[in-house]
Amino acid sequence: MAKAFGKTSGSMLPWLGLALILLIADQFTKVLILGYYRLGDATYVTSFFNVVRVHNTGAAFSFLASASGWQRWFFTGLGIAAAVFIVWLLRSHAGQKLFSFALACILGGAVGNVIDRTLHGYVVDFLDFHYGNWHFPAFNIADSAITIGAIFLVLDELRRVRRS
Protein backbone atom coordinates (compact mmCIF):
# COMPACT_ATOMS: atom_id res chain seq x y z
CA MET A 1 0.00 0.00 0.00
CA ALA A 2 1.32 3.47 -0.89
CA LYS A 3 2.24 5.82 1.90
CA ALA A 4 0.69 9.28 2.08
CA PHE A 5 4.15 10.81 2.34
CA GLY A 6 7.61 9.50 1.62
CA LYS A 7 8.90 7.17 -1.03
CA THR A 8 6.63 4.68 -2.72
CA SER A 9 7.50 1.92 -5.11
CA GLY A 10 7.37 2.64 -8.80
CA SER A 11 9.24 4.49 -11.46
CA MET A 12 8.46 8.03 -12.44
CA LEU A 13 9.44 7.35 -16.08
CA PRO A 14 5.93 6.35 -17.25
CA TRP A 15 4.57 9.55 -15.72
CA LEU A 16 7.25 11.65 -17.37
CA GLY A 17 6.37 9.84 -20.61
CA LEU A 18 2.72 10.81 -20.23
CA ALA A 19 3.73 14.42 -19.55
CA LEU A 20 5.91 14.34 -22.68
CA ILE A 21 3.05 12.98 -24.83
CA LEU A 22 0.76 15.76 -23.58
CA LEU A 23 3.49 18.34 -24.19
CA ILE A 24 4.05 17.10 -27.75
CA ALA A 25 0.30 17.12 -28.49
CA ASP A 26 0.03 20.64 -27.09
CA GLN A 27 2.98 22.04 -29.03
CA PHE A 28 2.02 20.24 -32.26
CA THR A 29 -1.49 21.72 -32.22
CA LYS A 30 -0.10 25.18 -31.47
CA VAL A 31 2.38 24.93 -34.36
CA LEU A 32 -0.56 24.10 -36.64
CA ILE A 33 -2.57 27.06 -35.37
CA LEU A 34 0.37 29.44 -35.74
CA GLY A 35 1.05 28.11 -39.24
CA TYR A 36 -2.48 28.18 -40.62
CA TYR A 37 -4.29 30.94 -38.72
CA ARG A 38 -3.67 34.65 -38.33
CA LEU A 39 -4.49 36.30 -35.03
CA GLY A 40 -8.29 36.48 -34.75
CA ASP A 41 -9.00 33.97 -37.54
CA ALA A 42 -11.71 31.42 -36.78
CA THR A 43 -13.09 28.25 -38.31
CA TYR A 44 -16.66 27.46 -37.37
CA VAL A 45 -16.76 23.72 -36.68
CA THR A 46 -20.17 23.25 -35.03
CA SER A 47 -22.92 25.42 -33.58
CA PHE A 48 -21.04 25.38 -30.26
CA PHE A 49 -17.34 25.04 -31.18
CA ASN A 50 -14.85 27.10 -33.18
CA VAL A 51 -11.13 26.85 -33.79
CA VAL A 52 -9.66 30.33 -33.32
CA ARG A 53 -6.26 31.91 -32.87
CA VAL A 54 -5.97 33.91 -29.67
CA HIS A 55 -2.87 35.18 -27.87
CA ASN A 56 -3.15 35.17 -24.09
CA THR A 57 -0.52 37.27 -22.31
CA GLY A 58 -2.14 36.59 -18.94
CA ALA A 59 -3.05 33.44 -17.07
CA ALA A 60 -6.30 31.48 -16.93
CA PHE A 61 -9.25 33.48 -18.28
CA SER A 62 -6.73 36.16 -19.39
CA PHE A 63 -6.03 37.11 -15.77
CA LEU A 64 -3.51 40.00 -15.76
CA ALA A 65 -3.42 40.06 -19.58
CA SER A 66 -3.50 43.87 -19.58
CA ALA A 67 -0.54 44.21 -17.20
CA SER A 68 2.61 45.95 -18.43
CA GLY A 69 4.56 42.80 -19.40
CA TRP A 70 5.96 41.64 -16.06
CA GLN A 71 3.34 38.89 -15.99
CA ARG A 72 5.13 37.02 -18.82
CA TRP A 73 8.14 36.39 -16.60
CA PHE A 74 6.09 35.89 -13.45
CA PHE A 75 3.95 33.15 -15.02
CA THR A 76 7.00 31.63 -16.75
CA GLY A 77 8.82 31.44 -13.41
CA LEU A 78 5.74 30.07 -11.70
CA GLY A 79 5.42 27.38 -14.38
CA ILE A 80 9.07 26.40 -14.06
CA ALA A 81 8.82 26.25 -10.26
CA ALA A 82 5.67 24.13 -10.53
CA ALA A 83 7.39 21.76 -12.98
CA VAL A 84 10.40 21.30 -10.68
CA PHE A 85 8.13 20.69 -7.68
CA ILE A 86 6.02 18.19 -9.65
CA VAL A 87 9.09 16.21 -10.75
CA TRP A 88 10.22 16.11 -7.10
CA LEU A 89 6.76 14.84 -6.08
CA LEU A 90 6.83 12.22 -8.84
CA ARG A 91 10.19 10.94 -7.59
CA SER A 92 8.69 10.42 -4.14
CA HIS A 93 5.21 9.19 -5.08
CA ALA A 94 5.52 7.42 -8.45
CA GLY A 95 3.72 4.35 -7.08
CA GLN A 96 0.56 6.33 -6.33
CA LYS A 97 -1.13 5.96 -9.70
CA LEU A 98 -3.99 8.45 -9.50
CA PHE A 99 -1.83 11.09 -7.82
CA SER A 100 0.98 10.60 -10.34
CA PHE A 101 -1.43 10.67 -13.29
CA ALA A 102 -2.74 14.01 -12.05
CA LEU A 103 0.77 15.38 -11.60
CA ALA A 104 1.86 14.19 -15.06
CA CYS A 105 -1.10 15.98 -16.66
CA ILE A 106 -0.30 19.20 -14.82
CA LEU A 107 3.40 18.88 -15.67
CA GLY A 108 2.79 18.42 -19.40
CA GLY A 109 0.42 21.37 -19.48
CA ALA A 110 2.60 23.66 -17.39
CA VAL A 111 5.67 23.02 -19.54
CA GLY A 112 3.62 23.55 -22.72
CA ASN A 113 2.50 26.98 -21.58
CA VAL A 114 6.01 27.86 -20.32
CA ILE A 115 7.37 27.10 -23.80
CA ASP A 116 4.78 29.44 -25.34
CA ARG A 117 5.54 32.27 -22.94
CA THR A 118 9.28 31.86 -23.50
CA LEU A 119 9.13 31.67 -27.31
CA HIS A 120 6.25 34.05 -28.06
CA GLY A 121 5.56 36.15 -24.99
CA TYR A 122 2.02 34.77 -24.88
CA VAL A 123 0.16 31.47 -24.76
CA VAL A 124 -1.51 30.30 -27.97
CA ASP A 125 -5.17 29.44 -27.32
CA PHE A 126 -7.46 28.03 -29.98
CA LEU A 127 -10.33 25.94 -28.60
CA ASP A 128 -13.46 28.11 -28.45
CA PHE A 129 -16.68 26.69 -27.02
CA HIS A 130 -19.78 28.87 -27.09
CA TYR A 131 -23.54 28.99 -26.84
CA GLY A 132 -25.28 31.79 -28.67
CA ASN A 133 -23.31 34.96 -27.91
CA TRP A 134 -21.70 33.47 -24.79
CA HIS A 135 -18.13 32.24 -25.25
CA PHE A 136 -16.07 30.27 -22.75
CA PRO A 137 -12.55 31.75 -22.81
CA ALA A 138 -10.44 30.10 -25.52
CA PHE A 139 -7.98 27.51 -24.25
CA ASN A 140 -5.54 24.87 -25.50
CA ILE A 141 -4.38 21.29 -24.89
CA ALA A 142 -2.04 22.39 -22.08
CA ASP A 143 -4.89 24.13 -20.26
CA SER A 144 -7.02 21.01 -20.67
CA ALA A 145 -4.26 18.81 -19.26
CA ILE A 146 -3.82 21.12 -16.26
CA THR A 147 -7.57 21.11 -15.61
CA ILE A 148 -7.81 17.32 -15.89
CA GLY A 149 -4.82 17.00 -13.57
CA ALA A 150 -6.40 19.32 -11.01
CA ILE A 151 -9.66 17.33 -11.11
CA PHE A 152 -7.77 14.08 -10.54
CA LEU A 153 -5.80 15.64 -7.67
CA VAL A 154 -9.10 16.46 -5.96
CA LEU A 155 -10.43 12.95 -6.65
CA ASP A 156 -7.23 11.43 -5.26
CA GLU A 157 -7.51 13.50 -2.09
CA LEU A 158 -11.21 12.62 -1.67
CA ARG A 159 -10.30 8.95 -2.06
CA ARG A 160 -7.49 9.31 0.48
CA VAL A 161 -9.80 11.03 3.01
CA ARG A 162 -12.48 8.40 2.50
CA ARG A 163 -9.99 5.62 3.31
CA SER A 164 -8.88 7.22 6.59
UniProtKB/Swiss-Prot annotation:
Localization per record: Cell inner membrane
Reactions accelerated catalytically: Release of signal peptides from bacterial membrane prolipoproteins. Hydrolyzes -Xaa-Yaa-Zaa-|-(S,diacylglyceryl)Cys-, in which Xaa is hydrophobic (preferably Leu), and Yaa (Ala or Ser) and Zaa (Gly or Ala) have small, neutral side chains
Gene Ontology cellular-component annotations: plasma membrane
Enzyme Commission (EC) number: 3.4.23.36
UniProt cross-references to InterPro entries, sorted A to Z: Peptidase_A8
Membrane topology label: Multi-pass membrane protein
Pathway terms, separated by semicolons: Protein modification; lipoprotein biosynthesis (signal peptide cleavage)
Domain of life where this protein originates: Bacteria
GO molecular-function terms, A-Z: aspartic-type endopeptidase activity
Keyword annotations: Aspartyl protease, Cell inner membrane, Cell membrane, Hydrolase, Membrane, Protease, Transmembrane, Transmembrane helix
Positions of the catalytic residues: 125, 143
Predominant location: membrane
Transmembrane annotation, as ranges: 15-35, 70-90, 95-115, 135-155
GO aspect biological process, one term: proteolysis
Family: Belongs to the peptidase A8 family.
Function: This protein specifically catalyzes the removal of signal peptides from prolipoproteins.
Alphabetized NCBIfam families for the sequence: lspA
Record-given protein name: Lipoprotein signal peptidase
Protein source organism: Polaromonas sp. (strain JS666 / ATCC BAA-500)
Protein encoded by which gene: lspA
